[in-house]
Design a protein with these regions (language model features):
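Rossmann-like dinucleotide-binding domain that binds NAD(P)(H)
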Residues: 168-251, 255, 349
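Conserved SAM-binding strand-loop segment of SAM-dependent methyltransferases
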Residues: 60-67
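C-terminal glycine/acidic-rich active-site capping loop/insertion
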Residues: 221, 229-232, 260-345, 380
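Rossmann-like NAD(P)H-binding beta-loop-alpha module
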Residues: 139-167, 173
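N-terminal Rossmann-like dinucleotide-binding module
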Residues: 2-58
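NAD(P)-dependent dehydrogenase/reductase Rossmann-like domain
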Residues: 2-15, 264, 347, 370, ...
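C-terminal capping/lid region of NAD(P)-dependent oxidoreductase domains
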Residues: 127, 154, 363-380
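Beta-strand-loop-alpha-helix segment that lines the small-molecule cofactor/substrate pocket
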Residues: 78-85, 89-136, 151
């Protein structure tokens, strides 16, 4: 059985969810409100004006401006963190240590030590941690997973991902960010589809961004492209990432090459992916929706934006073509993993490994492609 794919109606307990950060995070409010096993208990936002506006719009009465006050609330079972990148790890660790289950938007962390502390806090608290990686719950990924599970792919031989996105117009902390520091959208499907974690990575940077952007993080590269080896497997993968100063339509792509069938993502938006069958047969495919894997009450959220649909849907949702219908799958996976007391997909070890690929890939690029080994925190 696929984890979280079937709703168990016998479960009667509801999980009290608190959402932290109400930009992208507000997308999940109605999903939790309608999930049969969740209670959308509280929201948290520093801006009181925004906090009250969102709270009134969705009828959420429990509101916090202080994250510290929120995690002290004994009624909060789990927090879903959607704050700026530099806060992800510290807030996740604090929430775990406060006895809360944690779902956190990507990336999980920005340093190897933060990764270690997330794993340690999850283990010591006994609470679940799940990085809310959209791509591994997108309809495209679920389609390739189905090809894998039914044996149509054959033996997986190679995986490749790319995330090409011009971040002009995003909040200032994105300016000059090392490309591989936000690489989970291309790394995660490559490792997820082989049920693996990376052992080591080598990366090269390419091109140069403006001096003003370089000054922010000390990263000169427009592009970074990395190869990684999957631990305890004979599979390797390649990922490419850029953030600024290149002409390219937005693309999050994932290719999977099998001995019998291979899947290649479409080159442009609104085109269809391609299947290569047996080497010579090529066919375009229409990707089905996978809402049937969800409780009926939240199925419609695979195909529509749920927050301020008319004007102000979050930019990541617009540019990412709705994140492949992943949002209700992510919420359902998190809720059911906690209530069933099972590992989520991704679990804490997968979450930090997939994030560390990008962290160490950038370090490798600064060292002209030096091979970087990823620590294995399963013994922490």
């Amino acid at each position: 059985m696929v984890p979280g794919s079937v709703f168990h109606s016998k479960m009667s307990r509801k999980l009290n969810i608190a959402i932290v950060g109400l930009g992208f995070g507000a997308e999940f409010i109605p999903i939790y409100q309608r999930h049969p096993q969740a209670n959308m208990y509280a929201i948290c936002q520093r801006s009181k004006e925004k906090l009250d506006a969102v709270g009134q719009a969705f009828g959420v009465e429990k509101r916090y401006q202080s994250f510290e006050d929120l995690i002290r609330d004994p009624k909060v079972d789990a927090v879903h963190i959607n704050s700026p990148i530099h806060l992800h790890a510290s807030q996740s660790i604090a929430a775990l240590r406060a006895g809360k289950h944690v779902a956190c938007t990507v990336p999980a962390c920005t340093t190897i030590e933060e990764a270690r502390e997330i794993v340690k806090a999850s283990k010591e608290s006994g609470k679940k941690y799940m990085m809310m990686e959209t791509v591994v719950w997108s309809r495209e990924y679920l389609y390739v997973r189905e090809l894998r599970d039914t044996g149509r792919l054959g033996r997986i031989q190679f995986v490749r991902g790319s995330h090409l996105q011009n971040m002009d117009g995003w909040p200032g902390y994105w300016e000059g960010l090392p490309p591989m520091h936000y690489a989970t959208h291309c790394v995660s499907p490559c490792l997820g589809i082989v049920n693996g974690e990376a052992e080591y990575v080598s990366c090269l940077g390419s091109g140069r961004i403006s001096e003003a952007r370089i000054a922010k993080y000390g990263s000169p590269f427009s592009f970074e492209t990395a190869h990684f080896k999957v631990r305890n497997q004979d599979v390797a993968g390649e990922v490419t990432r850029y953030l600024f100063e290149a002409a390219r339509q937005y693309q999050e792509s994932f290719d999977c090459y099998g001995s019998q069938t291979s899947f290649e993502w479409q080159l442009t938006e609104h085109d269809d992916p391609v299947l290569h069958v047996g080497g010579e047969k090529v066919e375009k495919v229409k990707i089905p929706d996978y809402a049937h894997l969800l409780p009926e009450a939240i199925r419609e959220f695979t195909t529509k934006c749920v927050y301020d649909l008319a004007e102000n849907a979050h930019l990541s949702f617009i540019q990412g073509s709705g994140h492949g219908g992943s949002h209700p799958h992510l919420a359902h996976e998190f809720v059911t993993a906690v209530l069933e007391n099972r590992p989520s997909f991704p679990d804490v070890h997968q979450s930090v490994n997939w994030t560390m690929v990008g962290i160490l890939a950038h370090e490798s690029a600064l060292r002209a492609g030096e091979k970087m080994h990823l620590p294995n925190f399963r013994g922490v």
